[in-house]
């Protein structure tokens, strides 16, 4: 006899945990939350210590470790596509950068038919609802939400301050809050870390409250194989429990909600018979509903590291040496303080590279050490780096099922750098970053350019560097987009077109990727749609002011002009 619940949520990640928590706030509403990974072990420093963020990306316990097909514009490289596995999903292994995106992202969504209630001022109350910011609430920030947000503090690494000042000296705006009135410019970067220095995943923030409720059933190591249908209505799921091949069925009285992320959500829909007819028929999967957009429109952020030697011994290089790590770990474990308590992304910025961009098209994360995001290729000396990436690439990829076997990864192609705009943005971005790095604020610290290296100057040389060294920022999205056009998969409430009792709620339903990291927007979307599912009135629209660049120039006069013309 299959167990029966009101709602079945597939995926205990940033969206799924938010939904499970909010839906079970209503008395008597029962929810089954299925997670293919394991628990979020609180004693495992790899997922709980912010500074250890590279560790989960190196293994398979917490990471699906997908790979792309050979990327045609990236020398045919198979590129990493890490996704979180375990309670918390990608909030269990991400870089913990709390960035909401630009107000214009959401106003842009709201111009699309059917998405009129996704303006920034409609979304802002849900960002606030989800958040508790350590320095207190205001018009932009919450004080009572499940997500702990920590702001950078005085006395942190001097390189953070110097990099922000260098951005301002290069002629760009200063902003005190990248999630407040004005995203554009350089400033401190908030992080999803608790006041005790622990990673604030959605498992910690949401599930710690909800899992005490008898109406919420959480099953880990449960890999969902298929959504079950009667006609066009979703009525349940079948999943594999543990490492066995035994299938367990569960029934949903109201809805099945797919929150498996931008790779696994389209994969599950396709495996269940909802997707492009030709693809399903080629795999001998009975077509429940021909929906051509499932798995299409895939987007991501691509980024580069520009690395510099540091002439003063202030970088985090010593913390990479094994003999220094026990003391760092002990301070974090017992006091929740020190290097271990920060993700070390405490400064960043957003700029427009050209006047034709209405809002920023480049994001910076600054890091006071020279190392790859996944912890590899650390430079054996004091150094620092800027992560520089383009925000709204016109390139589009896709996710396609390769097999009926739920354990086989799908075919993933982001089609990175497929347009001339991509190449222009990266060339501009590298050159502008070099101008920023040459400003007086970094004079006390700046040594030689380690990467790309000062000899890399022409368009052709820069393009070669991008092809060989650009990496994902781990922001896959948009593969089950909201909208009303022929390629839309869901409506503005996440309901799958042409189906009943079936929703998708996660980063895959974004129509266009947002300007920045995706964890905060994903949680916001789940908060907003949770109210729709519960039949509640939406939170009142915000009246907060927000910055629109309009005719404002991209930048002012730099303090030190280092362009070739000036030389």
Swiss-Prot record:
Keyword annotations of the record: FAD, Flavoprotein, NAD, Oxidoreductase
Biological or metabolic pathway of the protein: Amine and polyamine biosynthesis; betaine biosynthesis via choline pathway; betaine aldehyde from choline (cytochrome c reductase route): step 1/1
Catalysed conversion reaction: choline + A = betaine aldehyde + AH2; betaine aldehyde + NAD(+) + H2O = glycine betaine + NADH + 2 H(+)
Residues making up the signal peptide according to the UniProt record: none
Co-factor(s): FAD
Segments for region (Disordered): 182-203
GO biological process, one term: glycine betaine biosynthetic process from choline
GO cellular component entries: membrane
Domain of life: Bacteria
Family under the similarity heading: Belongs to the GMC oxidoreductase family.
Protein task: Involved in the biosynthesis of the osmoprotectant glycine betaine. Catalyzes the oxidation of choline to betaine aldehyde and betaine aldehyde to glycine betaine at the same rate.
Name this polypeptide is given: Oxygen-dependent choline dehydrogenase
Record organism: Pseudomonas fluorescens (strain ATCC BAA-477 / NRRL B-23932 / Pf-5)
């Amino acid at each position: 006899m299959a167990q029966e619940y009101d709602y079945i949520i597939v995926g205990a990640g940033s969206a799924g945990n938010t939904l499970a928590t909010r839906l079970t706030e209503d008395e008597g509403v029962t929810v089954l939350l299925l997670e293919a990974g394991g628990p979020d072990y609180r004693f495992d420093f790899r997922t709980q210590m912010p500074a250890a963020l590279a560790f989960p990306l190196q293994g398979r316990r917490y990471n699906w470790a997908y790979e792309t097909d050979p990327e045609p514009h990236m020398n045919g490289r198979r590129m990493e596509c890490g996704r979180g596995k375990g309670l918390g999903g990608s909030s269990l292994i991400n870089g913990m950068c709390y960035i909401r995106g630009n107000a214009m992202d959401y106003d842009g969504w709201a111009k699309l038919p059917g998405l009129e209630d996704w303006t920034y001022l409609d979304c802002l109350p849900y960002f606030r609802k989800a958040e508790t910011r350590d320095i207190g609430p205001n018009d932009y920030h919450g004080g009572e939400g499940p997500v702990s947000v920590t702001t950078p503090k005085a006395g942190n690494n001097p390189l953070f301050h110097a990099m922000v000042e260098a951005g301002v000296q290069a002629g760009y705006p200063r902003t005190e809050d990248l999630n407040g009135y004005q995203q554009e410019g350089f400033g401190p970067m908030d992080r999803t870390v608790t006041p005790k220095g622990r990673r604030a995943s959605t498992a910690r923030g949401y599930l710690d409250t909800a899992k005490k409720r008898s109406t919420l059933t959480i099953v880990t190591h449960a890999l969902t194989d298929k959504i079950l249908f009667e006609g066009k209505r979703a009525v349940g799921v079948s999943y594999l429990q543990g490492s066995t091949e035994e299938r367990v069925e569960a029934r949903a009285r109201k809805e099945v909600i797919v929150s498996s992320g931008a790779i696994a959500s389209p994969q599950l829909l396709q495996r269940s018979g909802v997707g492009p007819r030709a693809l399903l028929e080629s795999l001998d999967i009975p077509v429940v509903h021909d929906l051509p957009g499932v798995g299409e429109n895939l987007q991501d952020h691509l980024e580069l590291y520009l690395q510099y030697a540091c002439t003063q011994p202030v970088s985090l290089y010593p913390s990479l040496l094994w003999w220094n790590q026990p003391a760092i770990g002990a301070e974090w474990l017992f006091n929740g303080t020190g290097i271990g308590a920060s993700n070390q992304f405490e400064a960043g910025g957003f700029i427009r590279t050209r006047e034709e961009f209405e809002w920023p098209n480049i994001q910076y994360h600054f890091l006071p050490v020279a190392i790859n995001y996944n912890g590899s290729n650390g430079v054996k000396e004091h150094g620092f780096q800027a992560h520089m990436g383009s925000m709204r690439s016109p390139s589009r990829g896709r996710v396609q099922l390769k097999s009926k076997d739920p354990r086989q990864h799908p075919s993933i192609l982001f089609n990175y750098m497929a347009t001339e705009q991509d190449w222009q943005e990266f060339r501009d971005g590298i050159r502008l970053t070099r101008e920023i790095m040459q400003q007086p604020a970094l004079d006390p610290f700046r040594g030689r350019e380690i990467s790309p290296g000062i000899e890399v100057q022409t368009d052709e040389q820069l393009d070669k560097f991008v092809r060989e060294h650009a990496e994902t920022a781990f922001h896959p999205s948009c593969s089950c987009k909201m909208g009303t056009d022929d390629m839309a998969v869901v409506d503005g409430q996440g309901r799958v077109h042409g189906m009943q009792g079936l929703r998708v709620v996660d980063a895959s339903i974004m129509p266009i990727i947002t300007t920045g990291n995706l964890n905060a927007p994903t949680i916001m979307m789940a908060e907003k749609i949770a109210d729709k599912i519960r039949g509640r009135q939406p939170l009142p629209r915000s009246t907060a002011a927000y910055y629109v660049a309009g005719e404002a120039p991209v930048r002012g006069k730099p303090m030190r002009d280092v362009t070739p013309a000036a030389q």
